[in-house]
Regions:
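His/Met- and acidic-residue-enriched segments that coordinate or traffic transition-metal cofactors
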Residues: 32-50, 60, 89, 101, ...
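Bacterial Sec-dependent N-terminal signal peptides
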Residues: 1-25
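Acidic-glycine-rich active-site phosphate/pyrophosphate-binding loop
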Residues: 29-36, 84, 90-91, 145-156, ...
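Asp-box/WD-like beta-propeller blade repeats and closely related beta-sheet repeat scaffolds
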Residues: 134-176
């Protein structure tokens, strides 16, 4: 019996060792992919564009590359972008003209598409200041200027009586993580209070309690709007933004926050709904519940879903046995279909707000935010294999 136990233990050690070696090989392969994809994007985009959502979403992925690999080239690329934009989003200094409906000019300071950059600035501040907290009125230390505008804008926004700032699903990714990041820097509890208040408003206009999914905005709520086959029309990238937002918020939110369990329940319900409508090939169609509405693969939604699901598995909030097959299929799609031989990321639906029947999305369809989403997913896959 002792000899049999010894053989069993030896076999277990051997299998564990083989698994660890295989995982390490996969980690090295994925690390190479991350660097190939990021180098391809940065080498073909040496200019630093404005601090609008599409560029900023890429930089959230680029910063994840730095956090995972300690890649100073990635760090410098985002830092140079921040400097180019004066550590600001929209640049108006006249608060009387600040707006938060859709707009791309400098008075749209309160619009979330000009606030996702604040996530990147907060991360850069934490790196450069070694996570030095900022108390009310603190401006003396040498890195405070990097988030001075971020704090100015968000604290002005929180001082207003309005709660309808997040009126579209993308906005949850754009700004929810800003609130938790700034809470951790300033320790101002108002960030968490307003996080919940603004999120509650968003839920009231675009959350579908039956499915656990989010409509892109109030225009698309069923039955006012339907897919081509009369179904509820949930836009994959829109729900991808939300699932990724939950992952980022839960990562930063204090464990004793009074609303943490509610965020977690919404996240887990959405994760289950997302997993249930994955296509056999591993991707999600642009209209999640009606594959015929805009058939074929799409990368940005798929990558955000992959990131959001992997984060939950890595942090004990999603059952690995249940979700591993989902992310493995998604990862196979991302690396064998979306990833092109030269490091480009294809099949990214262009900028928009809905699944469009007949819209061409192919291997040549790429964009900054799609690359950022891919990098988020890839970094989280490395962490999964390392565990």
């Amino acid at each position: 019996m002792k000899f049999k136990n010894f053989l069993f233990a030896a076999g277990t050690i051997f299998l564990t060792s083989c698994t660890a070696m295989h995982n390490q090989q996969q980690v090295e392969e994925i690390t190479d992919i991350i660097q190939q994809v990021n180098n391809q994007w940065q080498s073909t985009h040496p200019e630093h564009g404005r601090a609008f959502w599409d560029n900023a979403a890429y930089h959230t992925g680029n910063m994840e590359v730095y956090h995972l690999l300690n890649d100073t080239a990635a760090l410098n690329y985002s830092r140079e972008w921040a400097v180019y934009n004066d550590w600001k989003g929209a640049k108006s200094s006249n608060r009387e003209e600040w707006k938060y409906s859709y707009g791309e000019s400098d008075e749209y300071v309160l619009f979330g598409d000009y606030q996702v950059c604040f996530q990147v600035y907060a991360d850069l501040y934490n790196i450069d200041s070694n996570h030095m907290p900022i108390t009310a009125g603190e401006k003396s230390h040498p890195h405070a200027y990097k988030i001075a505008r971020t704090i100015e804008v968000m604290e002005y926004e929180m001082s207003t009586p309005n709660n309808d700032y997040w009126w579209w699903s993308d906005g949850l990714y754009m700004v929810m993580p800003v609130m938790t990041k700034l809470y951790n820097i300033t320790h101002n509890p108002l960030y968490l209070t307003k996080l919940y208040e603004y999120w509650s408003y968003a839920n009231s206009i675009m959350y579908d309690t039956e499915t656990g999914l989010y409509y892109r905005d109030a225009k698309y709520v069923y039955p006012k709007h339907k897919s081509v086959n009369g179904k509820k029309d949930f836009w994959a990238r829109g729900d991808g933004w939300v699932l990724a937002a939950f992952a980022k918020v839960l990562a930063d939110l204090p464990k004793d926050d009074i609303h943490r369990n509610e965020y977690l329940q919404f996240y887990q319900k959405q994760a289950a709904a997302v997993a249930a409508c994955q296509q056999p090939e591993g991707y999600w169609t642009r209209s999640m519940l009606d594959a015929e509405h805009a058939p074929g693969p799409e990368t940005s939604g798929t990558a955000f879903f992959t990131y959001g699901l992997l984060w939950g598995m890595n942090n004990g909030y999603l059952e690995v046995d249940s979700y591993r097959p989902v992310v493995e299929k998604a990862w196979k799609y991302l690396t064998t279909v979306a990833l092109q031989p030269d490091g480009r990321i294809g099949y990214v639906q262009p900028i928009g707000e809905k699944a469009i029947p007949g819209q061409v999305v192919d291997q040549n369809s790429t964009s900054n935010f799609g690359v950022g989403a891919f990098l988020l997913a890839a970094c989280e896959m490395v962490r999964f294999l390392q565990k």
